[in-house]
């Protein structure tokens, strides 16, 4: 249901933070987030997201810290508008982009058009941690 809430928020131009917390983001100059102060967000099943700019109003980018547990299942492919950037902090990630699997390791990054089917999954025996920045 939280995935549906995310899409409803986008459709009606309401910030997801306002729906989840009941308070509209108010910051418009800068938003400093200290360690442990991120807001958890459920965007797609199987992904653990932490919103790194939850209180910034009218954002054009969504910076998220993502943690994926090891998994042997193929990534669920999704499409959305905008542009997307992924930067791997720890572990290894397989980005499925259309019919191609692209491996990214710590320190690797990729910038791509998310209107094409894509999905990420952890590659290996340890969780993968990466930053994604989504502009929609």
Please name every model-derived segment.
Residues 67-68, 78-95:
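Short, conserved beta-strand element in jelly-roll/cupin
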Residues 38-76, 133-136:
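A short glycine-rich, His/Asp/Glu-containing loop-to-beta-strand
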Residues 9:
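The alpha-helix within a helix-turn-helix
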Residues 18-28:
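Short amphipathic recognition helices of helix-turn-helix/homeodomain-type DNA-binding modules
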Residues 52, 98-114:
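Short acidic-glycine-tyrosine-enriched beta hairpin
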Residues 47-48, 59, 105-106, 114-136:
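Ligand-binding loop in jelly-roll beta-barrel domains
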Residues 1-4:
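Conserved small/polar residues in nucleotide/adenosyl-binding loops
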